[in-house]
Amino acid sequence: MSLNNVPAGKSLPDDIYVVIEIPANADPIKYEVDKESGAVFVDRFMSAPMFYPCNYGYVNHTLSLDGDPVDVLVPTPYPLIPGSVIRCRPVGVLKMTDESGEDAKVVAVPHTKISKEYDHIQDVNDLPALLKAQITHFFERYKELESGKWVKVDGWEDAASARAEILSSYERAQNK
């Protein structure tokens, strides 16, 4: 089955499906799912010896301002394999700017049908302070050793901003 058949979610923007590209705490390898074939490609070996603090993926059938689908970080008790799909609920967004322009990273927690562990997290401020600090630290530094690349973290925004990011990106993809 092609991942193109995976919808953006069950009920946008509150109930989304995230296609995982990079497992949490994995080796410093940037994987990307090829949208046409569904194959997981090695995009690059990261120069900085760092690992993603959460599972990292995207929402299918969306188009962010950077030209890619909406990026999503998914905290889970266990790393998820690349190419897997998890049902989630957005709780916040980390706004950033990089060498390509505006770049937002939505944070979404597993849907209650997958795990009740995250039911109390309704907004980014409900996330553990240490997790937010780890995410910020990672994105401030993960491109430091890559020539011509840079990142500026602009700050955290709430669940409403995350939902708006998903909706506008979904509409942009539908209208392209």
UniProtKB/Swiss-Prot annotation:
Q: List the CDD domains.
A: pyrophosphatase (cd00412)
Query: Which residues are noted in the entry as Mg(2+) 1-binding?
Result: D66, D71, D103
**For this UniProt entry, which segments traverse the membrane?**
none
GO cellular component terms, semicolon-separated: cytosol
Q: Which cofactor does it need?
A: Mg(2+)
Q: Which reactions does this protein catalyse?
A: diphosphate + H2O = 2 phosphate + H(+)
Q: Which UniProt keywords apply?
A: Cytoplasm, Hydrolase, Magnesium, Metal-binding
Query: Where is substrate annotated to bind?
Result: K30, R44, Y56, Y142
Q: What is its main location?
A: cytoplasm
- What are the binding positions for Mg(2+) 2 in this chain? D71
Quote the EC number: 3.6.1.1
Q: What is the annotated localization of this protein?
A: Cytoplasm
Q: What does this protein do?
A: Catalyzes the hydrolysis of inorganic pyrophosphate (PPi) forming two phosphate ions.
What family is this?
A: Belongs to the PPase family.
Could you describe the subunit structure of this protein? Answer: Homohexamer.
Q: Fetch the PANTHER family from UniProt.
A: INORGANIC PYROPHOSPHATASE (PTHR10286)
- What is the protein name given in its UniProt record? Inorganic pyrophosphatase
